[in-house]
From Swiss-Prot:
Biased amino acid composition, Basic and acidic residues: 658-667
Compositional bias ranges of the Basic residues kind: 15-25
Requisite cofactors: [4Fe-4S] cluster
Region (Disordered): 1-29, 658-681
Enzyme class: lyase
Keywords noted in UniProt: 4Fe-4S, Iron, Iron-sulfur, Lyase, Metal-binding, S-adenosyl-L-methionine, Thiamine biosynthesis, Zinc
InterPro entries: ThiC, ThiC-associated_dom, ThiC/Bza_core_dom, ThiC/BzaA/B
GO biological process, one term: thiamine biosynthetic process
Protein's gene: thiC
Binding site for Zn(2+): 452, 516
Annotated protein name in UniProt: Phosphomethylpyrimidine synthase
Length: 681
């Protein structure tokens, strides 16, 4: 990025909150973040690229460098054994490459532009198709807000379908599919250590998890509808990724401005921040002013797929009056967003007129914003949902730009009391019907799920979805497993997310600490993402996804060997891990200490285990040397009790040490310090 200070466009607003000191500070901080934006990676990590079959297929990974393990020698001449670097999945795009030149005013490099052009089945449009977009472009009063370098939108050529599902069904392996295969394998072919490659068998609940993911396997899964590649031809900046239960569990982050808070620069900041902390996709749920302009800035700077809920913007166009929505206006909104580059639309097309009365006896009614909008429209007109009625036309639009459909659960339960009720599953069955229609047009589909569901009722959600939605990928909000923890709903939902991810859910929509309370800020986004990356990883481990345990094994080895710096660097959040450690052991000596602050130097279980192991090994070596010096015959039996006796001897020695210190579990720090210095206590 240029060193010159630049500014994102300022929004003019008469809203009173915009002028408050807190709002001003937030915007200034976001502007500073944008001004100083440069590619960065985590401590002791480096960006690497896995090369594909053509020069422009380069898959980014983050490689965590580890320190060597001391395996012997003396204090003055120690002997070391190298530890392998650990490659990990990286969603940060160019923002995670210290060599990248970044400028949000120009946007990211168009990674996929050549791939789209090479297929020769699209054409650049002479002008935008959306009447609303034409109005915005003609409004000179918006020039100060507009992304300056607007690309010309593309569309499928006449008679062509440009979806990844269409190519997959034709037997074509696209560059996107090859990119994904390399990415999903996470570079684990680079790992050679037997300890790192050990993994417990998983329980996959019917998922098929091959040892090595190939581009052909990716093609097969997409062709079968079990996975989607959200990749609008007008969002060439995005790096290909896949959502499906036979792949790594993915995480979505929600961002977006509202009528009372946030600005364009803050949303761009949240986008970059989200990709840094592991968001596989990002949904722009903006409902405030300048939705169109905000989305353009986000898309041009996003290395991950972007999803939206188009009904939110359509509602803004009718000043929030749901009854005034029309199909024509909504269709124009779809064209507007498809030509900007939105990768997937959430549509609440399964909220049917006859299902609305089913929610009357619920404790919390209809809690989905999109679901309530469509329910109100249906009741006010006493007509069927226009999204359902015009679903085939929607599919035709999506097929022309490769916009995936995320069929929304507008009747999801908003409390555990309402979980798994008649309305929820009636809508789910309708989403299965719509899935088949979308597939007729080669449009990619995933299914959205709840919501609030107690643990014992979660698995049924997965089995119902697989059966009635024909194994299309499932994408759930949590689910939250209890309703008693406002402020901690990233925890209540993370529990449910880990469970449903294990059962086969393909993507988890994060929940932040602000759920039910307010709009998330930057720190809330991080907390939600870390929680959900834990849930997704736990699900991958439980399923037995090949290679999922490598990072865990590396962490455990570093922990046992007291390699503190490696423990920090292998963590999902290295800075927090280091900060917690340094609260009690801030000195540099604490980074090499063979104990932690919980047990201290005199009662560390791992230190004791190492001492016992070393003692037993020394005893065994001495016995072997003695035996080698004694003539034996081939018929002499081997004494298998010797190693056991040696271990017992080691344990007895440590027991004596424990008793000699007074048989106390814990010791005062002053006493430990005095003992270490041979002072009286």
């Amino acid at each position: 990025m240029s060193n010159n200070t630049t500014s994102l466009p300022a929004e003019n607003s008469s809203h009173p909150r915009k002028g408050t000191p807190i709002r001003k500070k937030q915007r200034e901080e976001a502007q500073q973040f944008i001004n100083t934006l440069q590619g960065v990676t985590f401590p002791n990590s480096q960006r690497i690229y896995l090369q594909g079959s053509r020069p422009d297929i380069q898959v980014p990974m983050r490689e965590i460098q580890l320190s060597p393990t001391q395996i012997g020698g003396s204090k003055n001449e120690p002997r070391y054994e190298d530890n392998e670097a650990i490659p990990v999945y990286d969603t940060s795009g160019p923002y995670g490459d210290p060599q990248a030149k970044l400028d949000v005013h120009n946007g990211l490099p168009k990674l996929r532009a050549a791939w789209v052009a090479d297929r020769q089945d699209t054409e650049a449009l002479a002008s935008v198709s959306s009447g609303f977009t034409q109005q915005r472009l003609a409004d000179e009063g918006l020039d100060h807000l507009r992304f300056e370098h607007l690309p010309r939108p593309r569309k499928a050529a006449t008679g062509q379908c440009v979806t990844q599902l269409h190519y997959a069904r034709q037997g074509k392996i696209t560059p996107e599919m090859e990119f994904i295969a390399l990415r999903e394998n996470m570079g684990r072919e680079r790992i050679r250590g037997e300890v790192l490659l050990q993994q417990h068998p998983g329980q996959a609940f019917g998922a098929h998890l091959p040892e090595n993911i190939t581009a052909e396997f990716v093609r097969q899964e997409v062709a079968a509808g079990r996975a989607i590649i959200p990749a609008n031809i007008n969002h060439p900046e995005s790096e290909p990724m896949i959502i499906g239960r036979n792949f790594l569990v993915k995480v979505n982050a929600n961002i977006g401005n509202s009528a009372v808070t946030s600005s364009i620069e803050e949303e761009v900041e949240k986008l970059v921040w989200s990709t840094r902390w592991g968001a596989d996709t990002v949904m722009d749920l903006s409902t405030g002013r300048y939705i169109h302009e905000t989305r353009e800035w986000i898309l041009r700077n996003s290395p991950v797929p972007i999803g939206t809920v188009p009904i939110y913007q359509a509602l803004e166009k009718v000043n929030g009056v749901a009854e005034n929505l029309t199909w024509e206006m909504f269709r124009d909104t779809l064209l507007e967003q498809a030509e900007q580059g939105v990768d997937y639309f959430t549509l609440h097309a399964g909220v049917l007129l006859r299902y609305v009365p089913m929610t009357a006896k619920r404790l919390t009614g209809i809690v989905s914003r999109g679901g309530s909008i469509m329910a109100k429209w249906c009741l006010s007109h006493h007509q069927e949902n226009f999204l359902y009625q015009h679903f085939r036309e929607i599919c035709q639009i999506c097929a022309a730009y490769d916009v995936s459909l995320s069929l929304g659960d507008g009747l999801r339960p908003g409390s555990i009391q309402d979980a798994n009720d008649e309305a929820q599953f009636a809508e789910l069955h309708t989403l299965g019907e719509l899935t088949k229609i979308a597939w007729e047009y080669d449009v990619q589909v995933m299914i959205e799920g709840p919501g609030h569901v107690p643990m014992q009722m979660i698995r049924r959600n997965m089995t119902e979805e697989l059966e009635h939605c024909h194994e299309a990928p499932f994408y759930t909000l949590g689910p939250l497993t209890t309703d008693i923890a406002p402020g901690y709903d990233h925890f209540t939902s993370g529990i449910g997310a880990a469970m449903i991810g294990w059962f086969g859910c393909a993507m988890l929509c994060y929940v932040t600490p602000k759920e039910h309370l307010g709009l998330p800020n930057k720190e809330d986004v991080k907390q939600g993402l870390i929680t959900y990356k834990i849930a997704a990883h736990a699900a991958d481990l439980a399923k037995g996804h090949p290679g999922a345990q490598i990072r865990d094994n590396a962490m455990s080895k570093a922990r046992f060997e007291f390699r503190w710096e490696d423990q920090f660097n292998l963590a999902l959040d290295p800075a927090t891990a280091r900060a917690y450690h340094d609260e009690t052991l801030p000195q540099e000596s604490g980074k090499v200490a063979h104990f932690c602050s919980m047990c201290g130097p005199k009662f560390c279980s791992m230190k004791i285990s190492q001492e016992v192991r070393d003692y037993a090994a020394a005893q065994e070596q001495a016995a072997a040397q003695a035996q080698a010096a004694t003539p034996t015959t081939a018929a002499q039996p081997i004494d298998i009790t010797q190693p056991i006796n040696m271990l017992q001897s080691g344990m007895e020695k440590m027991s004596a040490e424990f008793r000699s210190r007074g048989s106390e579990l814990y010791h005062r720090p002053a006493n430990l310090s005095a003992e270490a210095n041979n002072e009286p206590t």
